Structure formats: C-alpha cells, structure tokens
Curated annotation (Swiss-Prot):
Belongs to the UPF0460 family. GO terms for biological process: nitrogen fixation. InterPro entries: NifX-assoc_nitrogen_fix. Keywords: Nitrogen fixation, Plasmid. Gene3D superfamilies: Protein of unknown function DUF269. The keyword Cell wall biogenesis/degradation does not apply. This is UPF0460 protein y4vQ. NCBIfam families: NifX-associated nitrogen fixation protein. Pfam families: DUF269.
Length: 162
C-alpha cells in the first residue's frame, strides 16, 4: 500500500532539502501554487506539491508503454517548461516563451524562445510517462535546461534581444 500525505493525498516523496532550495524548484513550486485557485493546497509543503512530478521506477513500470496523456499530465508538462522559461527570465532579464505542441497521443515538440533566438528545442514522446525519479533529478533537469539556454543567450545576445 502506498503511503500518502495527510495534507494533500499525494504520494509521499523522499524530501531532498538541497533540491527544494534551488531556484528552479522554488519557481516550479510557485507555479504549482498559482494553479491552486481554490487554496486547497495552501498548507502543503513544496515537496508535497511537487510529488506529482516524481515517478518511481515501480510507478513507471505500471504505466502502459502506449497511452494518451491526461489533462493532469499535460498540466504538469506545461508547468515544468513554464518554470524553465521563468527561470531563464529571472537569470537573464529577457522574456523566454515556452511553446508546446503535443498531439492527443503524447507526441510533439517543445520550444523555448527569447527574442528571435530558439534557446531550446526538443521532440518529445510518451508524455503520459512524464516525470522524474527524485526531486534531485527534477532539480538537475530544470537547472541544466536553464544553464544551456543561458549559455545560448550569452553566445548570441543580439539575436536574443531582437
């Protein structure tokens, strides 16, 4: 039987304090809180809010190989890349815009643009399996995307500001 949080009914996540204090994870937690328009998760910790982004190996094995993404998965996917864009903006001072084009089958493309510069482009598939093994892996993935995008902006600043 899976342990769940008393506050939110979400699966318990091994709390990684170092991951929770990273700028990217703080931004992601703010965005998740912003989606809670009724305040039903006001008392939840950041780790509890981010538990939906964590998919253990056991949980991943239970997810079918082929499947359509549900609205909750699509929301998590969009929030993740929006957090990347906001973190880029916080670091560089330039507005970064996420563009996601996902089919109903969970295949598509993610772009992040700043000015006329495409700072991130990725073809995605199996969105219904979107998630990370731990909070640390979530933080590392987000930070890497932000670092790579920032490096692209520093390499081509005139295009990013156009």
């Amino acid at each position: 039987m899976k342990k769940t949080s008393i506050n939110t009914g979400t699966p318990d996540v091994k709390v990684d304090e170092a991951a929770l204090v990273t700028p990217f994870v703080k931004c992601l937690a703010r965005l998740v809180r912003a989606q809670d328009t009724y305040g039903s998760q006001d008392r939840a910790s950041d780790a509890e809010l981010l538990a939906h982004f964590i998919i253990t190996e056991e949980q991943r094995r239970e997810i079918p190989i082929i499947g359509d993404p549900g609205p909750d998965v699509m929301l998590r996917f969009n929030i993740f890349y929006t957090a990347v864009a906001l973190s880029i903006e916080a670091r560089t001072g330039l507005v970064a815009s996420p563009i996601t084009m996902i089919s109903h089958e969970g295949f598509g493309r993610v772009l992040l643009t700043t000015g006329r510069l495409v700072v991130f482009s990725k073809t995605v598939r199996d969105i219904h399996r979107f998630g990370f093994a731990t909070l640390r892996k979530l933080a590392e993935a987000g930070a890497k995307l932000v670092d790579d995008a920032t490096a692209a902006i520093e390499t081509y600043p005139e295009v990013a500001r156009a």
